[in-house]
Amino acid sequence: MPDTLELEVATPERELVREQVTEVQVPAAQGYLGVLPGHAPLLGLLGIGTLTYMVGGNKRHISVHGGFLEVLEDHVRVLADVAERAEEIDIQRAKAALERSQREALNPALGVDPAEALAATMRAEARLATADKK
């Protein structure tokens, strides 16, 4: 069994990661999934949260929002709708987005779909949680 697996994280705009890692934790649609080398193959939906991976004993973090996940014995491919490395996240912008989405969720008169407001809140919270891990 291999000691590492190749991790690829990409969005429609860019590739964020392509490197050998020892472990990956991915926010899947039904909760977090831990992947080690030799994992059983699977396809899944990506959730909203922090993708964490280990390289040389160091943890690295990426905020991901929606997309797809493919796991093979020696490879993890994440195709995210949106992804940002922890160090790329603009904390002030994420805080402003969180405040705006919470305001929209609590005020139906603003005309924002409650499901959209909730999703925006979850995305902003995930970005802030990821940024906090850098």
UniProtKB/Swiss-Prot annotation:
Among its keywords, does the record have Cell inner membrane? yes
User: Its GO CC terms?
Assistant: plasma membrane; proton-transporting ATP synthase complex
The UniProt entry, under Pfam families, shows: ATP-synt_DE_N (PF02823)
What are the UniProt keywords, alphabetically? Answer: ATP synthesis, Cell inner membrane, Cell membrane, CF(1), Hydrogen ion transport, Ion transport, Membrane, Transport
Is the keyword Cell membrane assigned to this protein? yes
In what way does this protein cross or attach to the membrane?
A: Peripheral membrane protein
Query: What superkingdom does the record give?
Result: Bacteria
Q: Which InterPro entries match?
A: ATP_synth_F1_dsu/esu (IPR001469), ATP_synth_F1_dsu/esu_N (IPR020546), ATPsynth_dsu/esu_N (IPR036771)
GO molecular function terms noted in the UniProt entry: ATP binding; proton-transporting ATP synthase activity, rotational mechanism
Localization terms from the record: Cell inner membrane
Q: Which family does it belong to?
A: Belongs to the ATPase epsilon chain family.
Q: Which HAMAP family match?
A: ATP_synth_epsil_bac
Complex formation: F-type ATPases have 2 components, CF(1) - the catalytic core - and CF(0) - the membrane proton channel. CF(1) has five subunits: alpha(3), beta(3), gamma(1), delta(1), epsilon(1). CF(0) has three main subunits: a, b and c.
Query: What PANTHER family does this protein map onto?
Result: ATP SYNTHASE DELTA/EPSILON CHAIN (PTHR13822), ATP SYNTHASE EPSILON CHAIN, CHLOROPLASTIC (PTHR13822:SF10)
Q: What does this protein do?
A: Produces ATP from ADP in the presence of a proton gradient across the membrane.
Q: What is this protein called?
A: ATP synthase epsilon chain
Q: Which organism is it from?
A: Solibacter usitatus (strain Ellin6076)
Taxonomic path: Bacteria, Pseudomonadati, Acidobacteriota, Terriglobia, Bryobacterales
Q: Please name the gene that encodes this protein.
A: atpC
